[in-house]
């Protein structure tokens, strides 16, 4: 009633919203959005704008973005269905409603890469698809896994009691795997946030098409969907359902020059080679290059969105490298005034002697926790013969142990302003964890949906060292 009176509209009529009219914007912001913000709403989604004139849609995004950042206590943020001109300037984009299907899942990497090509790193889609189609757990998981290593992870779908968007409405296996990937995404926030900063400052896209460096894959259906996720990771999306007999997805991928490691298993893949591998529903092909330094949050209280006191840093052996972690409050615009902290993580690699130096290099104190607990995870690395830890000139105690193929050094209560130095010495420290075909085959045989006697015969032919009665 108040809005109708202000606009002098005919009572009970439908108002055609016009973002080019200042009075309409007054109604939108002062009578509708600002009261909702005062109730705790963080940002708004411009949806159902498909029929709006392009100029008006651009104006709507422009004014809503500016209004959402009207004070320095909160950064501007909107989610919009259309970006129109200069789409990288304003909203996080929403790809529209798509049918739930393997066909539409296959289109998503193409959209990721094309968005990156026009400077839009923050592009989103409905995890699991939006409407229609035939839902199944495997398809849902592949949506979740792709989105875990995508710009924006966002669950959404059409209304209806038969749609299954929430992880907990699925079977126990699907729910458990989904939860693992959602926790992994949360743990990766320090890395993703730093890569977002790099995009803002240097223009380096969060998603970089693989064909930037290997142009021949552009027209190759097997490899054209691969992409770099930030500076340290390579993603080779799974877009096909599994083979019903093997209970695995048969997937081909290309590993670029150098040495690469499976992010989860740590298996080693020599580069500049094509591979074929077999992936269970809980597996996803994501690789870190030799020397990769990846910061993870190591907190157990997953709902805490503050900067973590516990930080896990995974380092893959073989090459020296430096990674600069960027942190700020994540909410306000005070980072523009220098309220942030940059922390350099230097990895100096020798086969028998490697050192990690963590030191604050730029910004202000008081941004991150005063002290931190560091868990250094040296992937595919044997236990060192000796470990020495210093903070500045003070020698510290550490907890050192082996977990599978990884060597762990834990140091607690380290001040975040200053220099932490960890030196490890040992003979032939790197574990040669090259992907073992025999391990893959044996694992596949276990899951094959064939007669068990036939499994034993196949095993005997392949391995030749087992006998059965």
Segments from the language model and where they lie:
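Catalytic-domain carbohydrate-binding cleft regions of carbohydrate-active enzymes
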Residues: 1-289
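Conserved, charge-rich beta-strand/loop surface module that forms ligand/interface-binding patches
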Residues: 63, 69-76, 96-99, 104-111, ...
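Residues that act as N-cap/strand-start positions at coil-to-secondary-structure junctions
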Residues: 219-221, 247, 280, 339-341, ...
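Residue-level detector of beta-strand structural context in well-folded domains
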Residues: 224-225, 251, 343-345, 398
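Hydrophobic residues embedded in beta-strands of well-ordered beta-sheets
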Residues: 233-234, 352-356, 407
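Solvent-exposed beta-strand/loop surfaces of large extracellular or lumenal domains
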Residues: 261-281, 386-412
């Amino acid at each position: 009633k108040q809005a109708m009176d202000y606009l002098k509209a005919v009572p009970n009529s439908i108002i055609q919203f016009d973002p080019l009219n200042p009075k309409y914007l007054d109604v939108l912001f002062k009578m509708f959005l600002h009261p909702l913000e005062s109730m705790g709403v963080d940002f708004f989604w411009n949806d159902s704008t498909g029929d709006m004139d392009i100029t008006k849609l651009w104006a709507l995004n422009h004014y809503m973005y500016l209004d959402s950042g009207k004070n320095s206590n909160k950064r501007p943020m909107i989610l919009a269905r259309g970006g129109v001109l200069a789409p990288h300037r304003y909203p996080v984009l929403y790809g529209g409603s798509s049918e739930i299907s393997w066909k539409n899942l296959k289109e998503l990497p193409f959209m990721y890469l094309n968005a990156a090509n026009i400077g839009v790193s923050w592009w989103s889609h409905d995890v699991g698809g939006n409407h229609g189609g035939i839902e199944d757990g495997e398809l849902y998981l592949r949506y979740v896994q792709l989105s875990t290593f995508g710009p924006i992870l966002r669950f959404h779908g059409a209304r209806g009691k038969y749609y299954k968007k929430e992880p907990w409405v699925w079977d126990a296996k699907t729910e458990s795997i989904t939860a693992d990937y959602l926790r992994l995404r949360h743990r990766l926030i320090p890395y993703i946030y730093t890569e977002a900063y790099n995009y803002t400052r240097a223009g380096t896209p969060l998603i970089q098409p693989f064909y930037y460096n290997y142009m021949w894959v552009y027209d190759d259906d097997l490899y054209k969907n691969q992409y770099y996720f930030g500076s340290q990771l390579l993603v080779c999306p799974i877009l096909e359902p599994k083979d019903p007999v093997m209970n695995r997805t048969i997937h081909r991928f290309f590993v670029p020059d150098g040495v690469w490691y499976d992010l989860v298993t740590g298996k080693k893949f020599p580069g500049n080679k094509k591979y074929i591998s077999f992936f269970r529903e809980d597996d996803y092909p994501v690789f870190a290059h030799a020397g990769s330094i990846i910061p993870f949050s190591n907190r157990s209280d997953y709902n805490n969105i503050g900067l973590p006191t516990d930080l896990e840093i995974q380092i893959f052996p073989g090459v020296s490298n430096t990674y600069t972690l960027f942190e700020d409050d994540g909410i306000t615009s005070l980072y523009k005034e220098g309220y942030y902290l940059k922390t350099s993580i230097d990895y100096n690699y020798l086969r028998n002697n490697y050192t990690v130096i963590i030191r604050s290099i730029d910004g202000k104190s008081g941004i991150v926790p005063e002290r931190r607990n560091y868990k250094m995870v040296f992937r595919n690395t044997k236990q060192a013969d000796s470990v020495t830890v210093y903070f500045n000139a003070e020698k510290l105690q550490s907890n050192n142990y082996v977990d599978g193929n990884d060597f762990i050094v834990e140091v607690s209560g380290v001040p975040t302003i200053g220099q932490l130095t960890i030196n490890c010495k040992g003979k032939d420290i790197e574990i040669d964890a090259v992907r073992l075909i025999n391990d893959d085959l044996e694992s596949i045989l276990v899951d094959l949906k064939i007669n068990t006697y036939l499994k034993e015969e196949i095993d005997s032919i392949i391995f030749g060292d087992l006998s059965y009665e």
